[in-house]
Amino acid sequence: MTDLNKVINELGALGIHDVKEIVYNPSYEQLFEEETKPGLEGYEKGIVTQSGAVAVDTGIFTGRSPKDKYIVLDDKTKDTVWWTSDAAKNDNKPMTQDTWKSLKGLVTEQLSGKRLFVIDAFCGANADTRLSVRIVTEVAWQAHFVKNMFIRPTEAELVGFKPDFVVMNGSKVTNPNWKEQGLNSENFVAFNLTEGVQLIGGTWYGGEMKKGMFSMMNYFLPLKGIASMHCSANVGEKGDVAVFFGLSGTGKTTLSTDPKRQLIGDDEHGWDDDGVFNYEGGCYAKTIKLSPENEPDIYKAIKRDALLENVVVRADGSVDYDDGSKTENTRVSYPIYHIDNIVTPVSKAGHAKKVIFLTADAFGVLPPVSKLTPEQTKYYFLSGFTAKLAGTERGITEPTPTFSACFGAAFLSLHPTQYAEVLVKRMEAAGAEAYLVNTGWNGTGKRISIKDTRGIIDAILDGSIEKAEMGKLPIFDLAIPTALPGVDPAILDPRDTYADKAQWQAKAEDLAGRFVKNFEKYTTNDEGKALVAAGPKA
């Protein structure tokens, strides 16, 4: 049994005092009762749906709030963090010690004198590099979310549990002094790497806790030579591992959830001397337009203990997955064992042989699949191109092109080239091949079908793409197959999907120019300059 007085004293040391009661690492049964009990109001209230899963609303924040993210500037971070600058805008904004103290006071005061949920869990499936994380919240469903998403310790692992990082979620409190402090708004997601603390205020969105710890793994692991990746991963019967990089909405969760392969994880992984390992104990899947036909595994995972966010629940308790009226970024979190075909008992496997970059090209220019050279691998990894899809972040609803370094710039704590170097080293050591897969649109104006994309992924994983005859796509100089089993041959060359090929040419020149302009920020050193030739020619 965990000594709750010890936990109370540890919270006291952080500034949380007069704790009424601690609900420590509650069971799913207990969480279900807590989040659905009568009398809960507003965003604390959970609704039981027909599937048995509980649905909650996260309020005005239906996605992360990157503009409200800060890291305390101190001796540890000043020369290591990839700080935002005019040349390279990112979400790592510096915060002073004084502002940090003020925000910490707000959050600890909010959590004091309350009945608190405390979840102790791990981030990272490898015992020697994992973070021991303690999450403190007054909201039952937020405790449920982190129980789903982080790795659940055994009773033995909880004995003498010592957190490396504490997440204090004060979603009910906002910062009245934000203007004087020069912050973006009254809401905040702030990190102090020296103290090992994350503070959340004003936003109820569960993903801030998950992605907050991902940003921290992205700080600590590459400094140890371990690749830290915004990707999903799975493994075949022969032990062949594949990783799928991609931004939100490009198909990471969908495409790695494959009945023929065991899932390692759907979003965040490390790659060390032993192989690829998951950071998480759950999945966080988008549910907009979810159907049992297209995504049977995810659909089936939505049952008791799963937690739905911002979906529309009908009067009879059924869920309308097609309704995006609250947000296009409707989500479900569930423990990873809700998927039948997973790697057990620990979510890790060997070295990756296939590295797949997923992009959703709103321009209709890129081919559905191309095989990359080592130089192109670095170029497209650093470019991290996709179309931002509807609603995965606050204030974005239409597809617009975006370049996000390493397919996850929002979560990078170090300079992007550090991630590229570590990844390519790991790939070279393992003899891994890289592919660029476009799950977006083509000249027909429609999105490439999930059936064709799955056929492409199968061809990569079973090696048949290696036997295919290859052509070259001009401007981008990408190697593209002329035919693949189970894939509509008419889509493999994007030029063929346009009534007039000149249309493709014009769009391709436009997109190539955007790639070139974006990549300028990496050409300040020789390594970056050397990669320019691997990119498109504007």
From Swiss-Prot:
Enzyme class: lyase
Obligatory cofactor(s): Mn(2+)
Any Pfam family the entry gives: PEPCK_ATP
Binding site for ATP: 211, 230, 246-254, 295, 331, 447-448, 453
Main location: cytoplasm
SUPFAM superfamilies associated with the record: PEP carboxykinase N-terminal domain, PEP carboxykinase-like
UniProt GO BP: gluconeogenesis
Catalytic activity: oxaloacetate + ATP = phosphoenolpyruvate + ADP + CO2
Listed EC numbers: 4.1.1.49
Pathway: Carbohydrate biosynthesis; gluconeogenesis
Binding site for substrate: 64, 205, 211, 331
MF (Gene Ontology): ATP binding; metal ion binding; phosphoenolpyruvate carboxykinase (ATP) activity
Alphabetic keyword roster: ATP-binding, Cytoplasm, Decarboxylase, Gluconeogenesis, Lyase, Manganese, Metal-binding, Nucleotide-binding
Comment on bound cofactor: Binds 1 Mn(2+) ion per subunit.
GO cellular component: cytosol
PROSITE patterns in alphabetical order: PEPCK_ATP
Binding site for Mn(2+): 211, 230, 267
Localization annotation: Cytoplasm
Entry function: Involved in the gluconeogenesis. Catalyzes the conversion of oxaloacetate (OAA) to phosphoenolpyruvate (PEP) through direct phosphoryl transfer between the nucleoside triphosphate and OAA.
HAMAP family reported in the protein's UniProt record: PEPCK_ATP
Subunit structure: Monomer.
Family to which the UniProt record says this protein belongs: Belongs to the phosphoenolpyruvate carboxykinase (ATP) family.
Protein name: Phosphoenolpyruvate carboxykinase (ATP)
Organism from which the protein derives: Pasteurella multocida (strain Pm70)
Gene (name only): pckA
